[in-house]
Swiss-Prot record:
One of its GO terms (molecular function) is oxidoreductase activity. The lineage of its organism: Eukaryota, Fungi, Dikarya, Ascomycota, Saccharomycotina. Keywords: Mitochondrion, Oxidoreductase, Transit peptide. Belongs to the FMP46 family. Pfam families: DUF1687 (PF07955). This is Putative redox protein FMP46, mitochondrial. Putative mitochondrial redox protein which could be involved in the reduction of small toxic molecules. The active site is at C93. Its main location: mitochondrion.
Length: 129
């Protein structure tokens, strides 16, 4: 099998950034993601703040939705990639106001879509899979 075909059959990765996996918003998103049987996906749970490069990419995808989750996006994009916030535990980011504790963030890197609610998942992602 060619390399292209091998990659083609790999499940897509959807990342769920959450500071508290047992929270209702994270569990609701996980349930919605797992109920999608149309395509095989790997759900990656991430409890660390995105890297500077990831944050820049996410802002290009959908800055308004990203700012619902990361209210300080604009000022954070001006920080150096080495800033200790990037890659730090999300619980610490909740405490310093860099992460919205009321929601979680889902990202489909391949399809370049993101959101913070089950509704956004249904509107932006589920019908297009």
């Amino acid at each position: 099998m060619s390399m292209f075909k091998t990659i083609q059959f790999q499940p897509r990765v959807v990342t769920l950034f959450t500071h508290k996996l047992e929270s209702s918003h994270a569990q609701n998103l996980l349930t919605a993601l797992k109920s999608n049987h149309k395509n095989k996906i790997n759900i990656e749970i991430c409890q660390k703040f995105p890297t500077r490069d990831q944050l820049e990419y996410l802002a290009k995808i959908d800055k308004p939705d990203l700012m619902e989750q990361i209210p300080k996006t604009e000022s954070l994009l001006k920080k150096a990639a080495e800033d200790p916030l990037f890659g730090s535990p999300l619980q610490k980011c909740v405490e310093n106001g860099s992460w919205n504790k009321q929601t979680s963030l889902w990202v489909d890197w391949e399809k370049a879509v993101l959101g913070t609610t089950v509704q956004s998942l249904k509107e932006k992602w589920l019908p297009k899979n």
